[in-house]
Amino acid sequence: MRIEEDIKLGFKDVLIRPKRSILKSRSQVNLARCFSFKYSASIWSGIPIIAANMDTIGTFEMVKSLSKFNILTAVHKYYSFEEWKNFVCLSSKEILNHVIVSIGTSNIDFLKIKKIFLLSSELKYICIDVANGYSEHIVSFLKLVRDYFPDKIICAGNVVTGEMVEELILSGADIVKVGIGPGSVCTTRVKTGVGYPQLSAIIECADAAHGLNGQIISDGGCTVSGDIAKAFGGGADFVMLGGMLSGHKECSGDIIEEKSKKYMIFYGMSSVSAMQRYEGKIAGYRASEGKTVKIPFRGSVDSTIRDILGGLRSSCTYVGAEKLKELTKRTTFIRVTEQENCIFNAFKE
């Protein structure tokens, strides 16, 4: 047993210090990024936000809406091959270029993804989707996928420490997904006692990845656009959103009505709801590590995305970053004990 004495930080523990700026308007800020990758020869450009590969969020409908903003969607792994076939046949090149195909680590998953990628050469991204990226099994599976798909952009995770980021990149990952337990419907940290505050995980993992010409995705923990800015400021190349995109018509799940108000169900992928839906039961050796909540129905995701991007542009303006790429080097975090004045929060409509 050992104890690390350094205090690790989450988004709520810091604010970004404002700095002198020559920008006159938020409209001058360019949020697009352009990345080359360690293994794939592809070049990616767009806004580096990704809809999470949760079954309620990473839907084909979400792909169609977010592609208009040049934003990626990690499509969940529970669609059948026939559903993929129908989607690919009916989708344009522009839409397919914004799809990340998520898979598990079983032989069935590997056979399925081989069939999916035969449907179109416009599919370029793979996400190996497991909760615990520290397993030897994911490393061996990642090597298998990289050998079979040498030209695809592959991300793998989830991890929260630099040494495992390095291991995954050296095993074939272009991008590593960072985050254990920060999600809005994740209870891993309280159920297992395992995790890592997200901002510190980003800072440490980004340093490890960038030293090997890799990238990271910050996955989880963002509740407002300011958190997204902090993730980019800490060194994240991409930010993945789940809860912030929940409750929209592009999400899967039924709309329920109670007392004249509409809601959608949102749950973690290790929750009782998810396990019963896809496995029919909770395995005797498992415990739920997620929660199920009702989210007020919010209509189209378009207005939420515009609000997020507007907040991100404003963050850049406050520190003088004309491009999102400049935000990290323009960021100075200050430790704080408060984030906002909450006196009237109870009166919000």
UniProtKB/Swiss-Prot annotation:
The keyword Metal-binding appears for this protein: yes
Pfam families the UniProt entry points to: IMPDH (PF00478)
NCBIfam families in alphabetical order: GMP_reduct_1, PRK05096.1
Protein name: GMP reductase
Active site: 186
PANTHER family, sorted: GMP REDUCTASE (PTHR43170:SF5)
Binding residue positions for K(+): 181, 183
Domain of life (superkingdom): Bacteria
InterPro entries linked: Aldolase_TIM, GMP_reductase, GMPR, IMP_DH/GMP_Rdtase_CS, IMP_DH_GMPRt
Residues where NADP(+) binds: 108-131, 216-239
EC number assigned by the record: 1.7.1.7
Catalysed reactions, as listed in the record: IMP + NH4(+) + NADP(+) = GMP + NADPH + 2 H(+)
GO terms for cellular component: cytosol; GMP reductase complex
KW Nucleotide-binding (keyword) present: no
Family per record: Belongs to the IMPDH/GMPR family. GuaC type 1 subfamily.
Any GO BP: purine nucleotide metabolic process
Assembly and oligomerization: Homotetramer.
GO molecular-function terms, A-Z: GMP reductase activity; metal ion binding
Function comment: Catalyzes the irreversible NADPH-dependent deamination of GMP to IMP. It functions in the conversion of nucleobase, nucleoside and nucleotide derivatives of G to A nucleotides, and in maintaining the intracellular balance of A and G nucleotides.
Origin organism lineage: Bacteria, Pseudomonadati, Pseudomonadota, Gammaproteobacteria, Enterobacterales
UniProt cross-references to HAMAP family, sorted A to Z: GMP_reduct_type1 (MF_00596)
Record key words, sorted: Metal-binding, NADP, Oxidoreductase, Potassium
